[in-house]
Amino acid sequence: MSKPFKLNSAFKPSGDQPEAIRRLEEGLEDGLAHQTLLGVTGSGKTFTIANVIADLQRPTMVLAPNKTLAAQLYGEMKEFFPENAVEYFVSYYDYYQPEAYVPSSDTFIEKDASVNEHIEQMRLSATKAMLERRDVIVVASVSAIYGLGDPDLYLKMMLHLTVGMIIDQRAILRRLAELQYARNDQAFQRGTFRVRGEVIDIFPAESDDIALRVELFDEEVERLSLFDPLTGQIVSTIPRFTIYPKTHYVTPRERIVQAMEEIKEELAARRKVLLENNKLLEEQRLTQRTQFDLEMMDELGYCSGIENYSRFLSGRGPGEPPPTLFDYLPADGLLVVDESHVTIPQIGGMYRGDRARKETLVEYGFRLPSALDNRPLKFEEFEALAPQTIYVSATPGNYELEKSGGDVVDQVVRPTGLLDPIIEVRPVATQVDDLLSEIRQRAAINERVLVTTLTKRMAEDLTEYLEEHGERVRYLHSDIDTVERMEIIRDLRLGEFDVLVGINLLREGLDMPEVSLVAILDADKEGFLRSERSLIQTIGRAARNVNGKAILYGDRSTPSMAKAIGETERRREKQQKYNEEHGITPQGLNKKVVDILALGQNIAKTKAKGRGKSRPIVEPDNVPMDMLPKALQQKIHELEGLMMQHAQNLEFEEAAQIRDQLHQLRELFIAAS
């Protein structure tokens, strides 16, 4: 049930925030299609957007460039709007190998994927909220531009149950089977139902902690109640309930029958073309594969790889855009593109890569030409579908600036009064020794340093050099997985080491108030890693510390360096002026380490309502030294499974803690063995 958006925050807008909120709201009310919010690091961009949403009361989609930032935004929005529907929509694949064919080696690679059940449930919850409520905020990744089930067909397939309605038990079971729910009287889990006499228990696909009990008397629905599927305890009785399909790709029977006829027609036309071109192998392969899929669809209502026939199933013409999450967003919805300088180019690049792979499959008879229409949106289609949009970035790209007509909403002044870092340019010749002395100064006063290099080799050599000179240093690179990366950042903040060396990982989304110095080596080498936007983003990592400073090592000033330094000085000047006028003394951020690492941990926290206390993890210190190796090995296996579960649920901090415990347990195991 919809409620008005209610913003929950102990803070009131300050600094540049009130003016930014006013200008954005005025622009939206005046019908501006595109606006850009240029918000520096630490200026509270998310809080500004939350205020705009609360004031205008409009359903909103927030696009983030990756899962980690999406999880961070989800966590923040959840805190701002605890009473409203804040949802999370990202790719549900933990692992995905798309179908592909390599002609040079005559190798066909079957589609292989591992689906994260919890994220699948959250995706279903997101679309349900968008169809049912007005007070909805969906935080999504670029997964939002990929094909999804048609919302019209999805709505047609819903099963409405109300107390007092006349319906036969077998009719309910038949409808549940059409929604792809499976009967399972033993293991009651998401997307299943069980039958006990005249009682049907249904575990909705979009829920993780509430199930529905339907009690029938003869052919009448006598009672509907929600209960905890774990304990069986009744939570509440309700007058009505709507059951949504188990997946977004459910299609009514009549639509499937019609689609099958259209597929047969396309197959006949394609066979003719292949035979005319003397492609006998391709013709045989295509006929065999397509007929097998048609038989599966006829018998079961779906087949493996059914998304390749999505054009027929959604009733769209050749070349028309596929249905996506944007089709679920109400007409007056609002789109917020976070870190737009990264997200917008991502959207533009998705279509071409997907098409190149599928054209090969079509050419060699693995798929019908209609498979090309199972694709992400083209950039022009995204532009046509996008509602009123706010682009949010510290370094907006040319596209956003052009679309906004150069009229950018500035949010440069931070509520804390913190200034942008002081920038110095120093010569390359002595960069390593100069850096070493700067590191020692910072380490002496318990502050941290980030160093960014151009190549992996240089990062490794620099790390080794600093270690030889007694510095506590770690190296962050692309081979490190997400959990370990978060652990490294946490350890830096906790003071386990003083210097973090990286290449291109020290940019968007890393908030480390303890970092007072950012050193950029070879800053005068113009290119992607030393562009104006890259430099501003990297310099911004020191903007959360009162003593923030950035040193650019370069023998000459490139155009990118000049622009980055000029922009930083413009911001610093404006911030200083505001502080003087309002008597503000800059204050450092005392953000708890856990706050930054809890990236959307609300996503998968098991609700303990009525379930008793959760079983504590065994601390290695409490493990008896005489514990048998076999028992230790069993405990290690248990914790490994738990660690992977936390990692899949984006609970990075818990995963890192278990990892530390595993390390100690393994040492005990070796000693015991």
From Swiss-Prot:
The beta-hairpin motif is involved in DNA binding. GO terms for molecular function: ATP binding; ATP hydrolysis activity; DNA binding; excinuclease ABC activity; helicase activity. Belongs to the UvrB family. Its main location: cytoplasm. GO terms for biological process: nucleotide-excision repair; SOS response. Residues 431-597 form the Helicase C-terminal domain. ATP binds at G39, V40, T41, G42, S43, G44, K45, T46. Forms a heterotetramer with UvrA during the search for lesions. Interacts with UvrC in an incision complex. A motif (Beta-hairpin) lies at residues 92-115. Keywords: ATP-binding, Cytoplasm, DNA damage, DNA excision, DNA repair, Excision nuclease, Helicase, Hydrolase, Nucleotide-binding, SOS response. The UvrABC repair system catalyzes the recognition and processing of DNA lesions. A damage recognition complex composed of 2 UvrA and 2 UvrB subunits scans DNA for abnormalities. Upon binding of the UvrA(2)B(2) complex to a putative damaged site, the DNA wraps around one UvrB monomer. DNA wrap is dependent on ATP binding by UvrB and probably causes local melting of the DNA helix, facilitating insertion of UvrB beta-hairpin between the DNA strands. Then UvrB probes one DNA strand for the presence of a lesion. GO terms for cellular component: cytoplasm; excinuclease repair complex. It is found in: Cytoplasm. It comes from the Bacteria. Residues 26-183 form the Helicase ATP-binding domain. This is UvrABC system protein B.
